[in-house]
Curated annotation (Swiss-Prot):
Classification via InterPro entries: Ribosomal_uL16 (IPR047873), Ribosomal_uL16_bact-type (IPR000114), Ribosomal_uL16_CS (IPR020798), Ribosomal_uL16_dom (IPR016180), Ribosomal_uL16_sf (IPR036920)
Example GO BP: mitochondrial translation
Subunit composition and interactions: Part of the 50S ribosomal subunit.
Protein name: Large ribosomal subunit protein uL16c
Taxonomic lineage from the root: Eukaryota, Viridiplantae, Chlorophyta, Mamiellophyceae, Mamiellales
Length: 141
């Protein structure tokens, strides 16, 4: 699973979920993409589950790009722990996703396979998504 090698701060603030994605909101590498329509946190486990589902459905064909990275640690306390005694230890990693962010890109497969594999990956995401096709994409004859 994805996680940063090192971070500036071990325990960041939670932050807010306002606004649109200003960067990472256009198809840059592939011909097809999965785009987030609402804000949320996507964990490293969910990113990996989506990647596995897409690569298995495409039978390892084509090329897949993951356009998000879990760079924010989420802390948790043990169950039935008394209040106080500081903030909990980092438990898992998340990627902060805003509406418009491209999550995955895919190239080298037909549109039907890309659409179906992205649908399977979308079921594993905690946010609503939509399927995008690059503007200058021309289907192979």
């Amino acid at each position: 699973m994805l996680s940063p090698k090192r971070t500036k701060y071990r325990k960041p603030h939670r932050g807010n979920r306002k606004g649109q994605a200003l960067r990472g909101n256009k198809i840059s590498f592939g011909d097809f993409a999965l785009q987030a329509l609402e804000p949320g946190w996507i964990t490293s486990r969910q990113i990996e589950a989506g990647r596995r589902a897409m690569s298995r459905y495409a039978k390892r064909g084509g090329k897949l790009w993951i356009r998000m990275f879990p760079d924010r640690s989420i802390t948790a306390r043990a169950a039935e722990t008394r209040m106080g005694a500081g903030k909990g230890a980092p438990d898992y990693w998340v990627c902060i996703v805003k509406p418009g962010k491209i999550l995955y890109e895919l190239a080298g497969v037909p549109e039907t396979i890309a659409r179906a594999s992205m649908r399977i990956a979308a079921y594993k995401m905690p946010v609503k998504t939509k399927f995008l096709v690059r503007d200058e994409y021309v289907a192979p004859q």
